[in-house]
């Protein structure tokens, strides 16, 4: 029996509805094709027709401010096949002048990063140490995210809510009725994960926690200071942990071909699907299954580095961004561009979008949070006490953050400092203890050692050398050089008349043997 409907002929069985079997499938395909043809301006049609030949340069930008800080966040998919970055920016987290900012760079999918963006700050606020010990609460929040991902798939309902979030409860009821049948065992996301770089501003204190290669950079009077260190398998400490956990790391490098960065050789793990270029992340449980090791010693660990410091009025802004930005710009490049544009009077929204655009050649998604400290909202820098005799030898750059009270916590690497260019110590244990860093002196094993700045004109020890200031002769000897043992009497030097004079001006020749520092 044939029925005419419009200009299309279709077969209808006399015993059933008009759209059954193949006819229903054909109609659905035809409708999808018509909808695609009407969506001529949509990005989905563009990607289906062009693949990855064109980047997605549309940006999501948001900004808010209070009487102390202003923030702008912007994100762009770029050349990535899909958007796997996520972020959270909360100006008022509670009633105690607390702000929260976080960027999460996902890999293997966007679900873990999206879950972190929606849940991390909640886990932080719910911790018992949130009011008394914010550093400990932040560290526990990293581990809580991993635990939530391992327990069940309920976290996916928060990422992709279906039917107002009640799908999980409907599924639980249906599964209960099917209890006689064997139930599938939940498997944690093996190859899905995310980095995390979070910043909490409470009062005049700044707390930074990170795991992975997302980065936080501070601008102080136009100078860049890294508040986080990338966790890469090519670093000595991270490689040692990876190998001790049974993994094998290989190298990576990039090469620019036709304006795009292409991976030539990549650091990763031989048993990791697709390989990742980071050594710490949330998720990625395929590399966290060594039952003989604690979580902080796994091949991939979520154990974060924590930095605590005081905010002073010489701090201008923070830049918190995913790897897409840092692949193309150094810390100082980002600070210089932002600093110059602010002096030109450019809006913070425009500057943040420019930084995101700079991440386009990386071939990855890019997310940037720009946090501006308002002038006069934070205390001034306290003056340095110069009354003691040793103050002339103190290196003002000992503190990696430049403040008078900074705390750095590193749980795995004694050389993994908060600022690679500073002489800051770090804790080499996994207990979460923090290392105090003072702007006027640094303890390095004894009370008689201080950090001395370089003075090439006078022949002083090199920058950062350790010197002993307690010798009875009043001299300072570098511990990095081969010197005779200390004597109780002052050293003797020959008279100038006893030295051989071979130069016309009758001046004594240079002799390192009698070099006084």
From Swiss-Prot:
Mn(2+) 2 binds at residues 105, 323, 364. Residues 1-59, 380-517 are annotated as: Disordered. Mn(2+) 1 binds at residues 105-106. This is Probable protein phosphatase 2C 20. The keyword Ribonucleoprotein does not apply. Keywords: Hydrolase, Magnesium, Manganese, Metal-binding, Protein phosphatase. It holds the Pfam family PP2C. GO terms for molecular function: metal ion binding; protein serine/threonine phosphatase activity. Its EC number is 3.1.3.16. Residues 28-39, 499-517 have a biased composition (Basic and acidic residues).
């Amino acid at each position: 029996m044939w029925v005419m409907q419009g200009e299309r002929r279709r077969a209808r069985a006399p015993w059933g509805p008009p759209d059954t079997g193949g006819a229903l499938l054909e109609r659905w395909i035809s409708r999808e094709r018509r909808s695609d043809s009407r969506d001529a301006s949509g990005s989905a049609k563009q990607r289906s027709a062009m693949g990855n030949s064109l980047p997605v340069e549309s940006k999501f930008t948001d900004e808010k401010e209070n009487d102390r800080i202003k923030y702008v966040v912007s994100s762009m998919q770029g050349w990535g096949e899909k958007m796997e970055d996520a972020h959270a920016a909360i100006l008022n987290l509670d009633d105690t002048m607390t702000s929260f900012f976080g960027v999460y760079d996902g890999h293997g999918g966007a679900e873990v990063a999206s879950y972190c963006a929606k849940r991390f700050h909640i886990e932080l606020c719910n911790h018992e140490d949130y009011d008394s010990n914010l550093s400990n609460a932040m560290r526990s929040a990293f581990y809580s995210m991993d635990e939530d991902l391992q327990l069940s798939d309920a976290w996916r309902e928060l990422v992709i809510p279906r039917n107002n979030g009640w799908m999980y409860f409907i599924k639980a009821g249906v599964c209960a009725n099917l209890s006689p049948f064997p139930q599938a065992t939940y498997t944690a996301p093996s190859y899905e994960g995310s980095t995390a770089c979070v910043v909490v501003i409470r009062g005049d204190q700044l707390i930074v926690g990170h795991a992975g290669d997302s980065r936080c950079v501070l601008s102080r009077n136009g100078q860049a200071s890294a508040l986080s260190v990338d966790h890469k398998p090519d670093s000595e400490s991270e490689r040692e942990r990876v190998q001790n956990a049974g993994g094998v790391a290989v190298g990576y490098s990039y090469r620019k071909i036709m304006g795009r960065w292409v991976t030539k050789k990549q650091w990763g793990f031989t048993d990791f699907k697709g390989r990742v270029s980071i050594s710490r992340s949330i998720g990625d449980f395929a590399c966290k299954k060594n039952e003989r090791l604690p979580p902080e010693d796994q091949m991939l660990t979520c154990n974060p580095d924590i930095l605590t410091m005081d905010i002073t009025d010489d701090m201008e802004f923070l830049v918190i961004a995913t790897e897409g930005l840092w692949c193309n710009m150094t810390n100082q490049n980002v600070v210089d561009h932002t600093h110059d544009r602010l002096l030109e009077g450019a809006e913070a929204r425009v500057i943040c979008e420019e930084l995101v655009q700079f991440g386009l050649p990386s071939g990855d998604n890019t997310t940037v949070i720009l946090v501006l400290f308002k002038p006069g909202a934070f205390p001034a820098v306290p003056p340095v006490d110069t009354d003691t005799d040793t103050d002339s030898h103190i290196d003002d750059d000992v503190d990696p953050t430049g403040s008078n009270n900074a705390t750095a916590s590193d749980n795995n690497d004694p050389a993994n400092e908060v600022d690679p260019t500073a002489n800051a110590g770090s804790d080499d244990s996994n207990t979460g203890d923090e290392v105090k860093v003072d702007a006027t002196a640094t303890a390095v094993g004894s009370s008689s050692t201080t950090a001395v700045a370089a003075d090439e004109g006078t022949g002083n020890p090199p920058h950062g050398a350790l010197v002993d200031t307690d010798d009875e002769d009043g001299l300072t000897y570098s511990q990095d050089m081969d010197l005779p043992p200390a004597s109780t009497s002052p050293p003797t030097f020959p008279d100038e008349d006893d030295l051989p004079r071979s130069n016309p001006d009758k001046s004594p020749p240079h002799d390192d043997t009698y070099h006084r520092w």
